[in-house]
Amino acid sequence: TAIVGFYSLSYRFISLPMSIIGSSIGQVFFQKSSELKNDKKALKKITLETYKKLFKIGILPFAIITVFGDYIFAFVFGKDWIVAGEYAQLLAIWILFLFIHSPITNLFSTLEKQKDALLFNIIIIFSRILIISLGGYFFKDIYITIFLYSVLGIFLNLSILFYFFRLLKINIFNEIVYLLTNITIVILPLYVVRLLLN
């Protein structure tokens, strides 16, 4: 259907380029974290450095898509694909956190937490099915359903990220403040620009 086509294009457009970068960083992180698995202090340091590096790489492009996704898709693919751009706007912040958290999940292997990884994956699968079903049944609106799916994705990605922070004794509150502050600093001026353009 058209909805599937729009969603597929929006997801691939914003996730594929960053997944290549994330995969490369993830391989390096896995190698280094494996070498440091018995040195929790060094492992904590490299985990923080990697997560912040990923955030700094991803925040601007994903913020631009969040604010200007409909314009970008209309310009690149034509006006018939504005809907895909609107979907991308709803998905972008989730994909940002997916980009950040994916390389860090190598710690499941490094710290030998495969059972926890399995539990997280089961929760992810069932919660996604539930949110799509609820969105379709109660709201019958694709935009609301995609928004809820994206919010769920952000929550799940952050839950896994903070799970590792807790294991490595990284201050979770400080990192929440760091993320919220920097996302606001980047996105707010872009929204002002959009308002001026309208």
Residue locations for each model-derived region?
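Interfacial transmembrane-helix starts/ends
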Residues: 40-68, 85-88, 180
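Juxtamembrane boundary at the C-terminal end of a transmembrane helix
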Residues: 192-198
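Short membrane-interface helical motifs at transmembrane helix boundaries
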Residues: 60-79, 198
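Short runs within selected transmembrane alpha-helices of multi-pass transporters and secretion channels
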Residues: 11-14, 23-26, 62-63, 67, ...
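Membrane-interface helix-boundary motifs at transmembrane edges
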Residues: 40-41, 45, 111-113, 165-176
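Helix-loop junctions and terminal segments of transmembrane helices
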Residues: 10, 14-51, 105-110
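Hydrophobic alpha-helical transmembrane segments of multipass membrane transporters and ion channels
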Residues: 52-60, 93, 185-189
